[in-house]
Amino acid sequence: MGETQVASAQSFVLAFDSTHAAMAAQAAFKAAGASFALIPTPREISAGCGMSLKFKAEGAAEAQAFVADTVTGDAAKYATLYEATGYTKLS
């Protein structure tokens, strides 16, 4: 019988073009009970705001779905999702 592979959680960074959007997303993450860290936006990421949210998910699809379900309005409009390793842009 084959072994079942369990995906390990990956880290993602949600960067913003405005401080207002970052604060709104932070409130949305808190309301959803999500585990996250407010971090300085990495230099490798070009964003108008110096704050980003770092969180873990089982993969890019899960991270994108979580952000789409949790972050709304202007916060979603001015947010960009990246993988934390290599800062590959996802949305």
Give the residues covered by each predicted segment.
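A generic structural signal for short, non-catalytic loop/turn and secondary-structure boundary residues
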Residues: 7, 31, 46, 71-73
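Amphipathic, hydrophobic secondary-structure cores in small proteins
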Residues: 13, 17-65
